[in-house]
Amino acid sequence: MPRIAHDRRLADHASAWVRSFDCSHLSILIVCRGPIRKEAIDVFREMGVAKVGMLLSEKDSVVYPRALAPDVRIMPPERIHPVPDYTGATKAERVERVAQICAIAHEHGYTHVFAGYGFMSEDADFVRSLEKAGLIFIGPSSRVVEAAGAKDEAKRTALQVDVSVTPGVDDLTSRALFAKHGSVAGMVAAAGALGVSADVDGAEHLDAAERLLQASYAAGVDLLTIDEIAAQAQTEVDALLADLPGKRLRLKAIGGGGGKGQRILSAGDDAASLYREILSEVKATGVGDNKNVLVELNVEETRHNEIQLIGNGTWTVSMGGRDCSLQMHEQKLLEVSITQPMLTAAAAARRAAGDEAMAAALETECTLVARMEAEGERFGEAVGLNSASTFECIVDGDRHYFMEVNTRIQVEHRVSELCAILRFRNPDNPEEHFDVDSVVEVMGLLAAHGPRLPRPELAPRHMASLEARLNATDDSLSPHAGGEISEWSAPIEGEVRDDQGICLPNPDTGDFVPYRLAGAYDSNVALLLTVGADRQASYEHLAEVLRRTELTGHDLSTNIGFHYGLVHWFLGTDVHARPTTRFVSAYLVLVARLARAAEKIDLDTAYDALLKAP
């Protein structure tokens, strides 16, 4: 069975060098929800962290029908801190919530804050507020979040370090400011009238515009109206579409994630209106907010690949890749590990079996992954990455384009950690080392000891891994909010289940306690993972996990049947098939047609025909 829960304490290690990386002195406040909250509680406790507390939103499922919710049961009452919600609905509420989190941390003696993969986790203002309050964020610093997390800044950095990027415009607001005033002197004068200044000596006109805009954000002043930027968006979109006949474009907010803040448009679409929609969706309409949006070529038939990065500010290391192309409504559903060792072994096996074409395709895939990993490491070092982040790319054939960096832990981080171990070795005595097999764990280590941690080696763990997101959805994979889980079978051998603690039994009776899904934030219920000696084995194991999972309840609808069918499609076709991000939609259409055809079949007649078949 994959080693997930185990003793991670370093305080009692025989080596003084290893002991120096002990984390038991940390005091951590967890400010997120979902499976990552329970995972973080477990990992930090396994690391020996003496004090772990959590926020609890009023929107969370606080009570079972007949018992306390698992998050509440596993935490001492004095370490549960109620809040109205985790982020606030407006900028003012967000500022209020951040101040509340800082106050809770100071009042209760927390030194570190962990935000999982919620919106707060890559909010530079939130991280900066923690830093100013003397708290340590378990994640990238505000400097890194700004440099890597803002999609426009990240794209400029990518170009500087020879990373492939999609064609388009990354400086919409700079262009709008110059178009409004027509000269550097005009921009400087207009900004000065609003109390904004910046050093623009020797800067070209768009660079000068960007410097003035950055100064305006710091001052909380708008140099442009939303209407002015929207008009510039329409101008840029029209120009790009004229140069790219027949193509579509993607408007993408510089912040956001999970598909939020993005719109695809074609010739004739109202780019200005779509721009306004995006700003509203990512809550960037306030005075002083950075309202820049990327305008990029939309690569239609794409795969979505990403690289797991870890860094300490000096070095950056890749833990391998993930294929996240199997998605719907911009939400990932099934994530697959893609690593150089696995692809190399798979290519050799196919060649030995006489399948030269697939062997060559797998070798090409391996080369592609190697390029993405190298680019990810260069990018991480360029921005001084000092925690965990994900380098995301779109893949078109054997080419890839940098898409964005998520400066946080991802939902699917376990897909990578199940395939790799980070081995930290004493540079003065190579025989002394310690291993880390958890992204959450290494984030804690980096927050406590980052500059001292030597660049780790990558040691093999499992050759392949898969993650299925078990969501509360209807048959179209649209969210099905609410519902109650009354029974859930125990995990089978080798199954890794991150279920928010839902399956924790009643400590007195050992019985399953019915759980009411809140449905206030997203539809995810749990993450189901498996590993294998190769991709085929990991798919076969996941198929067995799904087959044996018994999940019942009232008004409960999940995508477990979808996953069971999808996994068997790959097992019956080829586990190394490379679906695009459009695959799931087409798959659902074909499944619906098959279901309608099956309704017309007389099962008794079909069974008799099978018995008579030679």
Q: Where in the sequence are the language-model features?
A:
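A short, hydrophobic secondary-structure junction motif
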Residues: 104, 108-110, 237-241, 443
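Short glycine-centered, acidic/aromatic-flanked micro-motifs in structured strand/loop junctions
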Residues: 115-117, 253, 530
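ATP-dependent carboxylate activation and anion-phosphoryl transfer catalytic cores
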Residues: 1-38, 42-46, 82, 92, ...
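Glycine-/small-residue-rich beta-strand-loop submotif within the FAD-binding core of flavoenzymes
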Residues: 86, 211, 411
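Intrinsic-disorder-associated interaction segments
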Residues: 94, 202-206, 226, 230, ...
